[in-house]
């Protein structure tokens, strides 16, 4: 892989969506010496269990570059928070508020797991939630360091690295995650902070954020893992409970 020994820079929490960008960001972070744990916001049955299986398979790939060929994957049960957002937040701000909630959860989990930063696959201007104004409004909920290895990469470069590390074919499987399954037609590209804060007041989000953190399930993935969630249940929480039996 080259770069620095994994772990020499400390540990980071990778927000892994299942798309092209976040696994590449995880690979590049490891190349810079950051040991990675992954978190995934699963929203079954609003999303299919196959979308979470895709994430398991992506972790298998990037765990090959990890410190001990083993990587923690934290499955966050996001549906309980996802539904109130869809029900109460104006369409144009759904993604903004959803991402703010995700950052809150990621920060709490990162602190719980002794991580020094959050890592994600954001690339400036690539989608509505990744304009500078969006990043400013979303990032406001945390003072935790955010590492964005792909911040100034274009899609061609990202795709090239995904091919190189073997994640491309997995990432393009046609299963939507919680950020894309109910994507509004006209998401705000320059969301205002004061408006986002006002909209959040319609949700009892603090209790729901804590619930998501407390009910997160952790599994450990290696390059040789043969875990197939779809054989264990229709929802991720059910599948992980059955995995213990």
What are the residue ranges of the model-derived segments?
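RNA-binding accessory domains that recognize and position tRNA/RNA substrates
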Residues: 1-15, 23-79, 140, 188-193, ...
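Active-site adenylate/phosphate-handling loop in enzymes that bind or generate adenylated species
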Residues: 1-6, 88-160, 164-165, 217, ...
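Conserved G/P- and acidic residue-centered "switch" motifs that form tight phosphate/ATP-binding loops
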Residues: 19
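Generic beta-strand/beta-sheet core signal
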Residues: 39-41, 76-79, 120-121, 149, ...
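Generic secondary-structure signature for well-ordered alpha-helical cores
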Residues: 60-68, 108-116, 163-167, 186-187
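Flexible, glycine/charged-enriched surface loops at secondary-structure junctions
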Residues: 65-73, 115-116, 121, 175
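Small/polar glycine-rich anion-binding or flexible loop at a beta-alpha turn
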Residues: 124-126, 174-182
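A short alpha-helix-loop-beta-strand transition element characteristic
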Residues: 166-174
């Amino acid at each position: 892989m080259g770069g620095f020994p994994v772990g020499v820079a400390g540990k980071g929490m990778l927000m892994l969506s299942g798309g092209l960008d976040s696994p590449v960001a995880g690979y590049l972070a490891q190349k810079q010496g950051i040991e990675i744990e992954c978190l995934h916001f699963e929203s079954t049955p609003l999303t299919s269990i196959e979308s979470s299986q895709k994430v398991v398979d992506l972790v298998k790939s990037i765990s090959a570059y990890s410190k001990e060929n083993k990587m923690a994957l934290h499955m966050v049960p996001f549906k309980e928070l996802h539904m109130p957002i869809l029900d109460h937040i104006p369409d144009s701000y759904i993604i903004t508020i959803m991402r703010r909630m995700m950052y809150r959860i990621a920060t709490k989990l990162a602190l719980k797991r002794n991580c020094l930063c959050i890592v994600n696959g954001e690339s400036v201007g690539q989608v509505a939630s990744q304009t500078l104004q969006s990043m400013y409004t979303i990032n406001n909920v945390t003072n935790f360091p955010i590492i964005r290895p792909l911040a100034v990469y274009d899609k061609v470069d990202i795709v090239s690295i995904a091919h190189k590390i073997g994640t491309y074919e997995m990432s393009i499987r046609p299963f939507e995650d919680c950020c894309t399954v109910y994507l509004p037609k006209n998401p705000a590209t320059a969301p205002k902070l004061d408006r986002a804060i006002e909209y959040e007041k319609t949700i009892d989000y603090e209790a729901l954020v804590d619930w998501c953190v407390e009910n997160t399930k952790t599994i450990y993935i290696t390059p040789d893992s043969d875990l197939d969630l779809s054989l264990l249940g229709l929802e991720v929480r059910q599948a992980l409970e059955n995995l213990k039996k």
